[in-house]
A protein has these predicted regions:
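Sequence signature of WD/YWTD-type beta-propeller architectures
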Residues: 19-320
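Sec-dependent signal peptide recognition
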Residues: 2-9
Length: 320
């Protein structure tokens, strides 16, 4: 196990229901031809759903998510990775399953027990499909990298002897590099994962929901109630959403031409939050995505083909 030690400085509007959306927005006459990929998202008790673009064809992806910790889809669209709670009395196991997207056959599968015995670990598949990034809400678990057959690679326990907290984030960059948050710091960590470089100190009272585009060139992050983008080196920060409410959950399209935004982000249950799915061009302009007022030209509410209600999400979301 290794401890990273070098830092190189260089509002409640709509309550949650079983419906797949709210009727605030109307479907556009058609989505742009260059709006590509599939958005996978959790919604209430309906499991993991998907909507493919530009056709806006919707459907189920994972029907039963009662024991599902996380899901991911490879960037080439060939594989699905799931992490499920497979624990039994006294045996706190997470099962990782890599399966074929075309026929559902299992490619690799293994059980994992974290140092803290946490059965709610999550996994992300590396860009080259060779590694799994394992995160946990227990600081004793740190951040772990495994091969897709379960072989241990490395565990990062913290930075400068300060462990990672449950609020810190970790994600892949191209070349199997890591992008991490540690407190208010955003950090890049290249293989072999024993040192890192500071991207930016986020000196804001409220920020989160950091994400990176597939190309590893741009970041999106929520600051206070709105979404901002910036270059991977933290330059050219721009506010890209506005409204009288809150936006969150930004996700880049595979080609980085668009951003999915969780607009009207609100608490919908004692422990849960939900949001309306809208898409904006990733051109550095600021778009009004308000749930009540008229939206800026170019804002696209996501509505399944044949339906008339905007898609609502309530958990993890990816665009592949």
């Amino acid at each position: 196990m290794k401890n990273l030690f070098t830092i190189l400085c260089i509002v409640l509007l709509v309550s949650c229901s079983s419906d797949n959306g709210s009727d605030i927005d109307t479907a556009p006459s058609g989505y742009p031809a260059d709006l590509e990929g599939t958005i996978y998202y959790k919604w209430a008790t309906d499991g993991i759903l998907k909507v493919s673009l530009p056709s806006a064809t919707g459907g189920s992806f994972i029907q039963d998510d009662t024991k599902l910790n996380s899901f991911d889809v490879s960037r080439d669209g060939k594989y699905r990775l799931t992490a499920t709670n497979a624990s039994t009395l006294g045996n706190y196991v997470v099962k990782f399953t890599l399966s074929n997207m075309n026929n559902g056959s299992i490619v690799k599968e293994f059980n994992y027990t974290s140092p803290a015995g946490n059965s709610y670990c999550k996994g992300q598949l590396s860009p080259d499909n060779s590694l799994i990034l394992v995160t946990s809400n227990d600081e004793e678990d740190g951040i772990t990298i495994l091969k897709t057959d379960g072989e241990f690679v490395i565990r990062l326990e913290g930075l400068n002897n300060v462990p990672f907290s449950m609020h810190d984030l970790a994600m892949w960059l191209p070349g199997n590099e890591l992008l991490l948050t540690h407190g208010n710091s955003i950090i890049r960590v290249p293989p072999p994962y024993n040192s890192g470089s500071l991207v930016k100190e986020m000196n804001y009272a409220d920020w989160g929901d950091l994400t990176v585009n597939h190309q590893g060139t741009q970041l999106a992050v929520r600051i206070d109630n709105h979404v901002y983008t910036m270059g991977i080196d933290s330059n050219n920060m721009r506010q890209v959403t506005t409204s009288n409410f809150k936006e969150s959950k930004p996700v880049y399209s595979p080609d980085s031409k668009y951003l999915m935004i969780g607009s009207n982000y609100r608490q919908s249950s004692v422990m849960g939050y939900s949001w309306d799915m809208k898409i904006i061009p990733n051109d550095g302009n600021t778009y009004n995505v308000d749930p009540v007022e008229a939206n800026s030209p170019g804002v696209l509410p996501v509505i399944w083909k044949g339906q008339d209600r905007i898609v609502i999400g309530s958990g993890d979301v990816i665009w592949k």
